[in-house]
Amino acid sequence: MLKFKYGARNPLDAGAAEPIASRASRLNLFFQGKPPFMTQQQMSPLSREGILDALFVLFEECSQPALMKIKHVSNFVRKYSDTIAELQELQPSAKDFEVRSLVGCGHFAEVQVVREKATGDIYAMKVMKKKALLAQEQVSFFEEERNILSRSTSPWIPQLQYAFQDKNHLYLVMEYQPGGDLLSLLNRYEDQLDENLIQFYLAELILAVHSVHLMGYVHRDIKPENILVDRTGHIKLVDFGSAAKMNSNKMVNAKLPIGTPDYMAPEVLTVMNGDGKGTYGLDCDWWSVGVIAYEMIYGRSPFAEGTSARTFNNIMNFQRFLKFPDDPKVSSDFLDLIQSLLCGQKERLKFEGLCCHPFFSKIDWNNIRNSPPPFVPTLKSDDDTSNFDEPEKNSWVSSSPCQLSPSGFSGEELPFVGFSYSKALGILGRSESVVSGLDSPAKTSSMEKKLLIKSKELQDSQDKCHKMEQEMTRLHRRVSEVEAVLSQKEVELKASETQRSLLEQDLATYITECSSLKRSLEQARMEVSQEDDKALQLLHDIREQSRKLQEIKEQEYQAQVEEMRLMMNQLEEDLVSARRRSDLYESELRESRLAAEEFKRKATECQHKLLKAKDQGKPEVGEYAKLEKINAEQQLKIQELQEKLEKAVKASTEATELLQNIRQAKERAERELEKLQNREDSSEGIRKKLVEAEELEEKHREAQVSAQHLEVHLKQKEQHYEEKIKVLDNQIKKDLADKETLENMMQRHEEEAHEKGKILSEQKAMINAMDSKIRSLEQRIVELSEANKLAANSSLFTQRNMKAQEEMISELRQQKFYLETQAGKLEAQNRKLEEQLEKISHQDHSDKNRLLELETRLREVSLEHEEQKLELKRQLTELQLSLQERESQLTALQAARAALESQLRQAKTELEETTAEAEEEIQALTAHRDEIQRKFDALRNSCTVITDLEEQLNQLTEDNAELNNQNFYLSKQLDEASGANDEIVQLRSEVDHLRREITEREMQLTSQKQTMEALKTTCTMLEEQVMDLEALNDELLEKERQWEAWRSVLGDEKSQFECRVRELQRMLDTEKQSRARADQRITESRQVVELAVKEHKAEILALQQALKEQKLKAESLSDKLNDLEKKHAMLEMNARSLQQKLETERELKQRLLEEQAKLQQQMDLQKNHIFRLTQGLQEALDRADLLKTERSDLEYQLENIQVLYSHEKVKMEGTISQQTKLIDFLQAKMDQPAKKKKGLFSRRKEDPALPTQVPLQYNELKLALEKEKARCAELEEALQKTRIELRSAREEAAHRKATDHPHPSTPATARQQIAMSAIVRSPEHQPSAMSLLAPPSSRRKESSTPEEFSRRLKERMHHNIPHRFNVGLNMRATKCAVCLDTVHFGRQASKCLECQVMCHPKCSTCLPATCGLPAEYATHFTEAFCRDKMNSPGLQTKEPSSSLHLEGWMKVPRNNKRGQQGWDRKYIVLEGSKVLIYDNEAREAGQRPVEEFELCLPDGDVSIHGAVGASELANTAKADVPYILKMESHPHTTCWPGRTLYLLAPSFPDKQRWVTALESVVAGGRVSREKAEADAKLLGNSLLKLEGDDRLDMNCTLPFSDQVVLVGTEEGLYALNVLKNSLTHVPGIGAVFQIYIIKDLEKLLMIAGEERALCLVDVKKVKQSLAQSHLPAQPDISPNIFEAVKGCHLFGAGKIENGLCICAAMPSKVVILRYNENLSKYCIRKEIETSEPCSCIHFTNYSILIGTNKFYEIDMKQYTLEEFLDKNDHSLAPAVFAASSNSFPVSIVQVNSAGQREEYLLCFHEFGVFVDSYGRRSRTDDLKWSRLPLAFAYREPYLFVTHFNSLEVIEIQARSSAGTPARAYLDIPNPRYLGPAISSGAIYLASSYQDKLRVICCKGNLVKESGTEHHRGPSTSRSSPNKRGPPTYNEHITKRVASSPAPPEGPSHPREPSTPHRYREGRTELRRDKSPGRPLEREKSPGRMLSTRRERSPGRLFEDSSRGRLPAGAVRTPLSQVNKVWDQSSV
């Protein structure tokens, strides 16, 4: 019941108080939409139009057949049918308007430019489809749009003229804005605008959005397409279909996504993704304004990316993804504006903040509508649409075929009641009432009087107004002149101010830039100084470290040197002691020589005495003997001393050897010291490298030059030092050579001394011999004395012997003399030897001194050399730093060189093959060259040998000369020694002679004894001498004792010396040990130093990284500082400008004050005048109020009079019509007799030209009516012809061919699709077969005139039977027969009950009415086309018959940006294997296409996709996505990228034709060799093949045992024995959709029956039934059905916490059941409502995962439902927002192996995400499907993905493994996943083609092996045309049938024409018998390799329909027996 409020009164009370007429008038006003006391926002929708809408709805609902059976309803309909028809005619309708063009097309509506036929006015009409609006009532808000347009008075919103509706559509007619939209304006300016233009349009957009907000609405879809430009250049905000009304808190609550993804605010996405309880306000519109501002300046959206999910992710993380490019330069105010809009909801600017923003400081917000716009569109006419992009007209606007009307009251039209609206309704009602009231005669006199008075007053006021207007014109003219001058001055002033401001801005920017540059310079200087300080400090540290290291090494070296020095000192002391001993020996030798001289002197004395004794005789001989004895003793002593001297010389040689060992140890120590110095030099080099590296960072070029100079200098120094080293080494070598020569000389001298010692010993021996002779002589003297004594006795004897004694004495004297001469000679020799010995000792001493000096000099030189080496190495190590940097660069170059070398090696391998022949000749030449080279080498070697021999000869000659010298010297000495020996021999001979003589004389002495006595006196004298000799002998003995004591002392010293030597040896050993320990310490210290160096390097790298980060921070801070300084400068400049303005304002204020004083006086005068006028105005207002009340009374009276007048008029019209009819009747009666009389018995013909005598008015009306009808008929006929021609032309243009006819290789489906478009037409409009295949030009010529059109050939074939669709839940993922997209499992689908074709519910209206069309009919119709074409003489082919031609208009993305900038209409031509794109249809002969696309690549692959995902084209209207097809090319090489081309077809038939034609061209690019190679490959097994009536519709499989597989079909449950090759039916169970075995209960869980009920079957009963299958009668199995779970489409079973659970999914809910062990049955525990049907279920250890619109997790403890994906993980934003882009869950797969952490793969329609058990991402990369998936299956480690005509296999690697997963693709016609196979890693697939069904076992590893052979990953999965895989099964059969000869007829050769020849020969196949117990011999295929090419969506029209069974009466070809081979290993 309606209640209308009038103030505070109750309507019932008011009705009781007011009269009925007043209430009727008020009710009339309410119906006119003008109820009193109601605002515009409170207006009720039930105006006159609303009540009419309600009346129309009531009438339509009552007209339903079900309600017409009610009597009262049928009476009501019959009663008011005419009235309703008349009212509907009076209502506005689409027929009142003529459509001129289409300017816009959206998701739910399209906008047309129309012209009102009656008035010619141009409007924009928005057409909306009611069904789409009702289906998306949460997205499209038509009521809000109508209310906003009708109630708005804002100039920023278009004015609504009319709103009306019909049965299928809603219409909004509003004012037309011909300037286009803002997107077109951006395209005009190349997507970027200046800031001045942006300022203007943003200001107007802000006012427009604010006007919507003031009305209480939020727009929610603000984008450039919804901002129009009117004819004056100002903007209008349109498209309020997404607007929402705000509540009292000014908030909006909505869950579904509203708006365009690129312009959505983050809070909208948050609410959309939440639980629906969140709200958002009008801030979302200001976010969209910010996005538009960003897009206007940068030419792109700030957050847009490839897919909507990524776009949503970027919007949610806008703080990270909002970036401002450097180009173009943008003012800081504008950047601040964008940042203030694209920010958080709380910080976002509102309307007040935007108005006060500095960017809009120059905007006059109150007069912006009157300001001139920057762009005014140029219009050619009122309906010009050139400023709009031409959109594509969608097929949904056209009227859909009639559907069956629902029975009963539906209520579908109730939401549209009150939609109608007419703008001029209220004004017209009032004016009509006034006019009708004025026609009434009531109160005419009073009105005339008042009219005269008012006319006079009006005349006076008009005169006054005329005078005032003249005065005003004069004043306006003067003011305009002044304003013109003023404006000119102001323009000049503004120009100067702007120039000044620009200059000031430039100055400020220059100042800031200078300051920033100065600061950066200072900073750079500081950095340079810091770097220098750091470098110096580092250099100092390195030097300090090197100094410390050098000190340590010097200390070690000094310690070693000190030890060596101590050893040297000790050795020198030993040498000194040895020298001292040698001096002692020499002194003793001198003493012995002196003693020898003394002895010689005494010997001479003795000789003198002997001479004296000769006279005396025997005394002298005795003395001589004593002397000889003494001489012998002296010789012995000399020999002992010589031995001691030899020992001393030996000790000296040992000391020399020890010294040499020490020198060698010293040299080794020096070498080790050099090694240490080299290492120190390396550390010094590291330090130098660091210093040089830091210098290179500062001064690159100077450092390079200095480094080069330094390198040259150091090289020179190095060469200089090396030369010095060489000189010093040479000098050392020379000194060592001198030393060696000296030592050799010393050794030679020692040898000479030894030889001389030998000579001395020989001489001593001679002295001994002489002593012995002396003793013998003394003995003789004694004897003589005795004889003299005897002679004294006898004088006779004395006398006789006197002479003899004298003779003997003389002889003795002679002998003494001889001996004295010999002793003198020996003494001379001894003196010579002593002199030589002294010379040798002196030379030895000098040589030793010289050696010491050389050693000291050598040490000094070595020290100096080491210092120079250290300095040189220090300088060299400084270069090594720079060299290491060069080496790093060299390593990079070497890496590049290595890459080039690898390429070079590859090239070399190729060259090696080409140079094989040349190498043979080269080898021969090489052999010849080698022979020559050998000869040359031999000659050269001989030359070298000769030179070496010459050198050796020279050396030998020198040595020989030296040896000769030595030999001469030695020989001379030997001659002297031999001379001495000869003398000794002569002396010995003389002694022997003397002995003989003595013997003779003794004989004489005996005779002269007497004479001896006389000599007694002489004897006494001799005795005295003997006494003297004895004393001398005692002295000699004493000396001998002294020599013995000295010998003992020397022995002691020798023992001490040996002890010292042993001690030195021990010290040497300890020294070696200490040296080894020192070496170990050195190695340890070296390792410590290296470790410290590594740590230092790591610290340096870390510090360098930190330094880089600090530098980046410093740079960012400096940039910010520069920006702030610029802002500061600008603010200062603004402050100065404001100060100047303030001063000017003050001056202006002063002038204004003065003017104010003047005006105040004038105001006082005017106030008085106004006061008088106010009094007059008050009186006039009073009179006006009086007139208003009188006017209202008159209106009421006029309305009453009008009602009465209408009644009277109706009565009068009825009377007049009755009287007219009576007159006509009477006139006809009067004329009738005359006609009869004239025509009776007369044979004349009637004259049709004679008019019938009727009244004139009636005839005129009748003639006018007939003319109008004829005109309408002509127009209707012309319109119909035009429509037919236009439709036929469009269809012909879409699929016409060129002048050639199609080749027989063209698929029959393409011709059948062309046939279908002709079959579904009516016969009178059906084109001929020739016209369908003829070129468009000939068809246009044929239909150019009506005569030619009527002469067309009308075929008798016609088929127009509509489908009987039933909308239900889809139980199997398949392909839509219309749009070629996926019909997903568990979603709503439309299925024809007759032909079983399936499509989307929205696509069912577009499917051609070809239900039940037999394939033979289409084939016959196609053959008729071919015959007509072949017989046509005008269709001669000019091109090769193998080419296929198709052309038509389609759309391609603008600028190849996936539709982000719209679509361009292009003319597409398929010519041969190329797709050519042109701008227009009329192509000239030489015109080149805009773009080309090659379908048959020589080194790549091309795939055709009949459907694409919505996320690929995020900015494309969702209504256009089903019409898009995609072509992809993938080259095999990585040098060229792939290519993608999207095409937008105008309709579904066009899309199907294009897809079929493109696929046929791509498929025709293969060659026979590739087919043969493909046929030879093997993969998997074909388990079963069913054909014709034996075909089963399989749904699922389950391995029941090792041999049996259960098969669920639409016909029931079957068991397949893979070993016995039999298929057995299990009775008692209906259609089976899913099977699962519960092993704990030994039950089979399945979905079965027509009701799709969940039921349990005992496993034992199934086994029993299989065991009894051979019996004629089997017991039926009765399943245990869950009555509460019916209509189930999916279930999952598992074990959670040791409890058996079932999760069953139904269309609107999910049911959870748990097994109760006490009751032994499953009980329902929870029912959960779902917004979308569940598509997947997975059991975990503690919960259940399900997929509906999102992935949810059900906790099995509390049975709570929550989202599975973690919202806090921003990387999962594409998956979280997937539902908003129509990408829903498909499957859940657990991919972790046993024992690993749980990991799941969540599969969506377009991608897959890896997550862990907590819903968080577990892997960084997602899986992308290469095409639209149907189903998923996982068999570890392979993921199987079924597509339309292919299977994709992906190897899921472990989580730790890196790299992309391996993929393989198999071409399988219509694959359907059945279930897992018996073997691991394999699945069962069902493949249906034509009337055959094949069950395939596909194994993952086989697929991988075959797939990876040519297809590595998605990018390499496409083979080249020369290496492409085998054809599909359909293509193979088609080509085999076409190429194979006709089979012989007869009973022995029954063959099916479509069976491949390869499967026929020698093979038998048994047909399946449906009777139980009869085994089925399944097909044993040879395991033909299924092609691994990419998918080619066939897009055929009959493919889906052919899957069902043929209708009754269709003829089937009998099966032939075929025997095939089958491998059981992989089942």
Swiss-Prot record:
Its main location: cytoplasm. The active site is at 221 (proton acceptor). Residues 1091-1302 are annotated as: Interaction with Rho/Rac. The modification N-acetylmethionine is found at residue 1. The modification Phosphoserine is found at residues 433, 440, 480, 582, 1940, 1993. Residues 1591-1881 form the CNH domain. InterPro entries: AGC-kinase_C (IPR000961), C1-like_sf (IPR046349), Citron_Rho-interacting_kinase (IPR017405), CNH_dom (IPR001180), CRIK_dom (IPR037708), Kinase-like_dom_sf (IPR011009), PE/DAG-bd (IPR002219), PH-like_dom_sf (IPR011993). Residues 1327-1337 have a biased composition (Low complexity). CDD domains: CRIK, STKc_CRIK. Residues 1290-1303, 1339-1351, 1948-2003 have a biased composition (Basic and acidic residues). Residues 97-360 form the Protein kinase domain. Residues 361-431 form the AGC-kinase C-terminal domain. Keywords: Acetylation, ATP-binding, Cell cycle, Cell division, Coiled coil, Cytoplasm, Developmental protein, Differentiation, Disease variant, Kinase, Metal-binding, Mitosis, Neurogenesis, Nucleotide-binding, Phosphoprotein, Primary microcephaly, Serine/threonine-protein kinase, SH3-binding, Transferase, Zinc, Zinc-finger. Residues 1290-1310, 1322-1351, 1905-2012 are annotated as: Disordered. It is found in: Cytoplasm. Its EC number is 2.7.11.1. The keyword ATP-binding applies. GO terms for biological process: generation of neurons; mitotic cell cycle; mitotic cytokinesis; negative regulation of hippo signaling; neuron apoptotic process; positive regulation of cytokinesis; regulation of actin cytoskeleton organization. Residues 453-1297 form a coiled coil. Changing residue 230 to V: In MCPH17; impairs kinase activity; exhibits abnormal mitotic cytokinesis; exhibits multipolar spindles; increases the neurons apoptotic process. Disulfide bonds: none annotated. One of its GO terms (cellular component) is membrane. A motif (SH3-binding) lies at residues 1953-1958. It is linked to Microcephaly 17, primary, autosomal recessive: A form of microcephaly, a disease defined as a head circumference more than 3 standard deviations below the age, sex and ethnically matched mean. Brain weight is markedly reduced and the cerebral cortex is disproportionately small. MCPH17 is a severe form characterized by lissencephaly, enlarged ventricles, agenesis of the corpus callosum, cerebellar hypoplasia, and brainstem hypoplasia. Patients manifest delayed psychomotor development, intellectual disability, spasticity, axial hypotonia, and dysmorphic features. This is Citron Rho-interacting kinase. The gene is CIT.
